[in-house]
């Protein structure tokens, strides 16, 4: 995530490198 909600997998900064469906 972009430092917001946790995605499906543990995201490391920068998170935006991993395109993941973020629940909004």
UniProtKB/Swiss-Prot annotation:
Function: Waglerin-2 selectively blocks the epsilon subunit of muscle nicotinic acetylcholine receptor (nAChR). Also has effects on rodent ionotropic GABA(A) receptors (GABR), since it potentiates I(GABA) in some neurons and depresses I(GABA) in others. In mice, it elicits tachypnea, ocular proptosis, rapid collapse and spasms, whereas no toxic effects on respiration and blood pressure are observed in rats.
Family the entry assigns: Belongs to the waglerin family.
Listed transmembrane segments: none
Main location: secreted
Keywords: Disulfide bond, Ion channel impairing toxin, Neurotoxin, Postsynaptic neurotoxin, Secreted, Toxin
Tissues where the protein occurs: Expressed by the venom gland.
Protein name per its UniProtKB record: Waglerin-4
Top-level taxon: Eukaryota
Pfam families membership: Toxin_33
Subunit structure: Monomer.
